[in-house]
């Protein structure tokens, strides 16, 4: 049975086309991975099917009474609500059913026999619904999911308005899973999860009876939970049976076959054109030349999709710094309350360090405290001599109406326009990306704009906050290569062991500071 039908979907931003005449059908119980390079339109597709974005053309049709759950990381949580009260809202419909049962029992005292029978029948249906959803052990279900995703660690009575962005996303994910909708729409759900929580979510999705569509650049995770791949590429959406690795094999084979057919056809076209040119003027061979020309005219020419630009990262190194990069003495970090005990640490020239640990416990706050962006609650940070810092923030500020071109040009006004364009192109951005407003670019494309800034300023220390969060596989591999070759020091927050292993010299486990 079809849950969702998408017909002839076409959409773009200005002159930049995202989809062209795309159709899609989701069946009950399908576990779909939605994949594609940065900027191909995966998140845009999610926004369209959930009604948050109106397509230029096409039809979106959900089946009746289907319950859709979407992990929207921009959902606003009301100040004053606790973590527990937000999670309880996953069962609002069940609490409504319970209230209706109580209302019916109160009305039975004044009911006649027919009314009583009707009320008892309705109560029976409602009670069956409550029982089938384990209504009377909801608190235990809430606690189980909260522990499994690390939400309980924030404190179930904590005010959600005081949580970090990553913590709020975890709460929203927990609420979504508790709702158990007919279709789950998940956009990079592992970005804010630690290894043990990713493992739990993996098992949950493997056993999930209903359908889901998953966007993720975490390939091992994707491989373990999906049975279908939909690939977004060159404004098309194509279906492949199997997991991501199986898709890669079939896709590579199809691409190779198409290239071979293209090369054969190009040779045939060249031979036909050569024959026509040599023989069209001679009376004896004119008819044969005309016949070859007709064949050329009727030929359906094979076209190869243009190769997507791949980033080529290269970070410039400045002068050598002093021995120490940072020294922290009795450092206590936080905002209204301390997030750590007294921290004493130092970073020396040449070190490449990954800061790891649970999400939302203060890793970004530590970076900002070391950089002087946030004032510590106690202690001091001493920065070494001759330090030239490059800082990569986790997200681009919202509402940036500048184009990517303007963003870089404003930072480096001495560069010419061709130089700015070339710099952005080296980061894997096309002309249409370069001329688009930063706010309409995908998360991965926005990250590439921020990397472009880092690449065009000399540094001897790079401070990177979750640099891989929105990058596709090719961009991650290229970034790792560039950071391995970087001659300076690196301090980064990262939750992907497969990225920082083989790159860093030291690992700081933040849980030892908390």
Each predicted region: which residue ranges?
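ABC ATP-binding cassette signature C-motif
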Residues: 1-260, 309, 318-514
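Intracellular alpha-helical coupling/juxtamembrane segments of multi-pass membrane proteins
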Residues: 250-305
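Post-kinase regulatory C-tail/linker adjacent to protein kinase catalytic domains
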Residues: 313-315
């Amino acid at each position: 049975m079809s849950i969702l039908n998408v017909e002839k979907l076409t959409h773009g931003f200005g002159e930049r086309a995202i989809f062209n005449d795309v159709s899609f059908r989701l069946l009950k119980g399908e576990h779909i991975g939605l994949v594609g390079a940065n900027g191909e339109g995966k998140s845009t597709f999610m926004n369209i099917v959930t009604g948050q974005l109106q397509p230029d053309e096409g039809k979106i049709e959900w089946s009746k009474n289907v319950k859709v759950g979407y992990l929207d990381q921009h959902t606003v949580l009301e100040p004053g609500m606790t973590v527990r009260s937000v999670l309880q809202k996953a069962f609002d419909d069940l609490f409504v059913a319970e209230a209706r049962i109580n209302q019916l029992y109160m009305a039975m005292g004044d009911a006649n026999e027919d009314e009583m029978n009707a009320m008892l029948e309705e109560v029976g249906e409602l009670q069956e619904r409550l029982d089938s959803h384990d209504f009377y052990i909801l608190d235990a279900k809430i606690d189980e999911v909260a522990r499994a995703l690390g939400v309980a660690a924030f404190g179930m009575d904590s005010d959600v308005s005081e949580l970090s962005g990553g913590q709020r996303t975890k709460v929203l994910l927990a609420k979504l899973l508790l709702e158990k909708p007919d279709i789950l729409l998940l956009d990079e759900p592992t970005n804010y999860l630690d290894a043990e929580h990713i493992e739990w979510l993996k098992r949950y999705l493997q056993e999930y009876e209903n359908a889901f569509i998953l966007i993720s650049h975490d390939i091992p995770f994707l491989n373990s939970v999906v049975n279908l791949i939909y690939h977004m590429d060159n404004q098309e959406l194509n279906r492949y049976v199997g997991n991501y690795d199986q898709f890669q094999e079939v896709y590579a084979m199809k691409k190779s076959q198409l290239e071979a057919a293209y090369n054969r056809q190009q040779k045939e076209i060249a031979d036909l054109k050569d024959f026509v040119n040599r023989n069209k003027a001679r009376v004896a061979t004119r008819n044969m030349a005309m016949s070859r020309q007709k064949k050329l005219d009727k030929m359906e020419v094979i076209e190869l999709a243009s190769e997507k630009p791949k980033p080529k990262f290269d970070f410039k190194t400045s002068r050598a710094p002093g021995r120490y990069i940072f020294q922290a003495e009795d450092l206590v970090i936080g905002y209204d309350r301390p997030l750590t005990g007294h921290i004493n640490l130092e970073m020396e020239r040449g070190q490449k360090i990954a800061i790891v640990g649970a999400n939302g416990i203060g890793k970004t706050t530590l970076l900002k405290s070391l950089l002087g962006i946030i004032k510590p609650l106690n202690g001091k940070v001493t920065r070494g001599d001759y330090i030239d810092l490059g800082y990569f923030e986790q997200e681009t500020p919202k509402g940036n109406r500048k184009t990517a071109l303007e963003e870089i040009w404003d930072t480096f006004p001495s560069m010419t326009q061709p130089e700015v364009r070339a710099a952005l192109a080296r980061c894997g951005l096309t002309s249409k990306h370069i001329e688009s407003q930063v706010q309409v670019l995908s998360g991965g494309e926005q990250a590439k704009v921020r990397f472009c800034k880092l690449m065009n300023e000399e540094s001897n220390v790079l401070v990177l906050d979750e640099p891989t969060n929105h990058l596709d596989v090719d961009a991650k591999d290229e970034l790792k290569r560039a950071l391995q070759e970087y001659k300076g020091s690196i301090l980064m927050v990262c939750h992907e062991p497969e990225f920082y292993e083989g790159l860093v010299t030291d690992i700081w486990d933040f849980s030892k500071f908390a």
